[in-house]
Amino acid sequence: YERIVWQYWENSDTYPDGIPYIDLCHESVDLHQTDGKGYKVIRLNDKNYQEYIDDINPYIFNLKESENQLAQKADYIRAKLLYKHGGIWLDSDAIVFRELDMIFDKLEHYEFYGYKINSPCIWAFACHKNAEIMKKWVDNNDKILNESQGKNIFYGEMGHRSIEIFINTPNIFLDDATKVQSIDHRYAWKYMHFTNGLEKFINDEQPFFMMNNALICDYIKKYTREELKYSNILISQFLIKAGVKF
């Protein structure tokens, strides 16, 4: 398997110029790519992703530019991409603290490594190219697109809902998701202003933390780099720990 970390980001109609904290999350991934055994970062966008995947289902282009629809487009892309190439997928709201060797090392023993038992969290996973579960996920997404023609697809239908039906596939391992995301998403907004966030949510062995952009308040998405630098919100605490330069 190749030591590649894949990411995808496309600006939505709501944030046509991007989201500053997402840029900083990307920088945290880049910052640690020479740590440990190292990894290469390939970050895709709406202009270049077609260079990396084949046989794109034409119905994917019926999805609109809303954040909800772009999330579904990213679900389709990540499945196709990692099936073809293998490596690690990280959503763009991941803040990386250290080397990712502990994740890559899982691929010495399994075809697929992910988080959350019974329903894989697709915001972060690792796999070999041509992994059996990835083939099933890709095929199921094509089935969903062909039947819907890319219209009225609900959130997660091509993501965790699509892959979770294949969790009994041999040679996969699903780990405890709280190892990398210990915030209850239902109450994420309550934790943004914790002053002791590192102590509460991060341990020394943790490779990254997933912020879950869909649940981040709009006013925080509008914070500039300068505002994030001097803020003590949870995102800023994590970015500082990651070593990002604002």
Segments from the language model and where they lie:
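Glycosyltransferase-associated regions of secretory-pathway enzymes
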Residues: 1-74, 90-246
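Small-residue hinge/turn detector
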Residues: 75-87
